[in-house]
């Protein structure tokens, strides 16, 4: 084998150092300069509350431990983030009045980002304000209330959240509530009750987005029937690829296209990979076998034995790897079924325990956009995915609200509308 003369080595190194930049990186940067990248769902406020407790009000947010948090200011900048819907989530297992109190604290915590770092964040309420914040070099911050239980059956509480800057309401979280069925709980209403329909109407009147992540398919279809404005799924993926009820079926995707809404793709591995979903269910079944109360668990009273048995099971049944490419598959599928005008990004960063390879934090959005470009997506279509689609939905909801401005505020109650005693 011939070797290169040593005299050529400096020239080759210099040539490599001045090689043309990655064409996809350049294209992504151009798109994100013109269009704000908007993520529909990030649980950073709740993650701060959970992991640093009372220090959440004062902990420096510029740089946080990436092993603990998916988000910080430096990584938001590196990821080219232009707009973020911060989730204000509280457990659906709490009494609803407690959920209201905790929601108010989460809202204030999200507002504190802009209060503490005004050069980095700007709190916004409209599509135009979001574009202006992006143009000024700030991350536009919006709020999403992640669960209908958080209004405690009160349209007045819903209006108060709107006055505090909430931009969407997720109709349920993990539990079915008095007026809407959840995707992950036993149905009670076959979708929305009359009060649930009144909530959708009030959301339209207020200019708040109707978020259908977490709800049952019956609730999805009822909301799509009732709403006057386009809906969002703030963090859901394609059920045809991963068959969990948290994802969106092709039937509903076609309805979303007709409605003008947008499905913002989730990164949670159990909603991305069917193999990972099945593995997770099997693992949960093993844990239940070890600990089934009161007397039937294989390792009742023997926590070390249960721990070893689970480790042995995991060794024999390794966790399936989930990747950035699989997330892109969901985006491709939704674009194919509903159209490229109806897909976005809703990562669920800081709300999940693990993430796909290649999507470890908010700095990784450009890698996902580059993957789609490799698959043949045009810059214009990537811009739609990144932010233009949800901006269109926001503007449409604002227009609907303007047309309903003469209507009185809703005053219905669960008892009055649903006949609940």
Describe each model-derived feature in a short phrase:
Residues 5-14:
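Bacterial N-terminal signal peptides
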Residues 19-190, 243-421:
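N-terminal hydrophobic targeting/anchoring segments and the immediately downstream early-domain regions
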Residues 150, 163-247:
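Divalent metal-binding pocket/active-site signature
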